[in-house]
Amino acid sequence: MLDPIAIQLGPLAIRWYALCIVTGLILAVYLTMKEAPRKKIIPDDILDFILVAFPLAILGARLYYVIFRFDYYSQNLGEIFAIWNGGLAIYGGLITGALVLYIFADRKLINTWDFLDIAAPSVMIAQSLGRWGNFFNQEAYGATVDNLDYLPGFIRDQMYIEGSYRQPTFLYESLWNLLGFALILIFRRKWKSLRRGHITAFYLIWYGFGRMVIEGMRTDSLMFFGLRVSQWLSVVFIGLGIMIVIYQNRKKAPYYITEEEN
């Protein structure tokens, strides 16, 4: 089993979980700032947005997680803010981040769809890296399996939990998001019929579908009235993505790749 603590500085423990999230954030900010000028968005506005959105998204992710496990946290109030032990629900962070983005874009007079479109692939790569935090914390795993011989030894050993090998669902989602990120990069450079909002829609559909399937393999999912909350939200994401495509096509929204960029 790998030590979840990456660096110990006296009483201060820096966990791999935090490093994975921060690394994903840094890469996401870099990629978004690099794409921003193409949509006539000032890169410094991206930094301003992150300074506001990131802490609020973390808070939203934690609040979402605590709400659906309130029976436990109501008896352990001191653990509500112990995010270093894990327990961040990505959907809570995404919903909070989207709300902050809408308000921020409106105040900065930035087209919301343009902002979402340049942020979507960056969010996907951040999620891909962030899932490795679950790996180090031994969480977000799946059902028991006989063996994991197809995986590298360090992953196989870390997925030996409570006397059994577990499906590395963190890895499946990480790779799924990485593939989605690569496809978005290809689409936005090569697909000339790509309209404003289509990248956001692709993200919602791609991530929603992958999460819905992978969530069914997990054994530690948040439950609500006997159902997996994330699977219901995945259906909402997919439906919303389809609606965005239909709406933007009927509206004849501007193409993502403009004539000047061809």
Swiss-Prot record:
<dbReference type="InterPro" id="IPR001640">
    <property type="entry name" value="Lgt"/>
</dbReference>
<feature type="binding site">
    <location>
        <position position="131"/>
    </location>
    <ligand>
        <name>a 1,2-diacyl-sn-glycero-3-phospho-(1'-sn-glycerol)</name>
    </ligand>
</feature>
<feature type="transmembrane region" description="Helical">
    <location>
        <begin position="167"/>
        <end position="187"/>
    </location>
</feature>
<keyword id="KW-1003">Cell membrane</keyword>
<feature type="transmembrane region" description="Helical">
    <location>
        <begin position="109"/>
        <end position="129"/>
    </location>
</feature>
<feature type="transmembrane region" description="Helical">
    <location>
        <begin position="9"/>
        <end position="29"/>
    </location>
</feature>
<feature type="transmembrane region" description="Helical">
    <location>
        <begin position="197"/>
        <end position="217"/>
    </location>
</feature>
<keyword id="KW-0472">Membrane</keyword>
<feature type="transmembrane region" description="Helical">
    <location>
        <begin position="226"/>
        <end position="246"/>
    </location>
</feature>
<dbReference type="GO" id="GO:0005886">
    <property type="term" value="C:plasma membrane"/>
</dbReference>
<dbReference type="Pfam" id="PF01790">
    <property type="entry name" value="LGT"/>
</dbReference>
<comment type="function">
    <text>Catalyzes the transfer of the diacylglyceryl group from phosphatidylglycerol to the sulfhydryl group of the N-terminal cysteine of a prolipoprotein, the first step in the formation of mature lipoproteins.</text>
</comment>
<keyword id="KW-0808">Transferase</keyword>
<dbReference type="GO" id="GO:0008961">
    <property type="term" value="F:phosphatidylglycerol-prolipoprotein diacylglyceryl transferase activity"/>
</dbReference>
<comment type="similarity">
    <text>Belongs to the Lgt family.</text>
</comment>
<feature type="transmembrane region" description="Helical">
    <location>
        <begin position="41"/>
        <end position="61"/>
    </location>
</feature>
<dbReference type="GO" id="GO:0042158">
    <property type="term" value="P:lipoprotein biosynthetic process"/>
</dbReference>
<keyword id="KW-0812">Transmembrane</keyword>
<feature type="transmembrane region" description="Helical">
    <location>
        <begin position="80"/>
        <end position="100"/>
    </location>
</feature>
<keyword id="KW-1133">Transmembrane helix</keyword>
<comment type="pathway">
    <text>Protein modification; lipoprotein biosynthesis (diacylglyceryl transfer).</text>
</comment>
<protein>
    <recommendedName>
        <fullName>Phosphatidylglycerol--prolipoprotein diacylglyceryl transferase</fullName>
        <ecNumber>2.5.1.145</ecNumber>
    </recommendedName>
</protein>
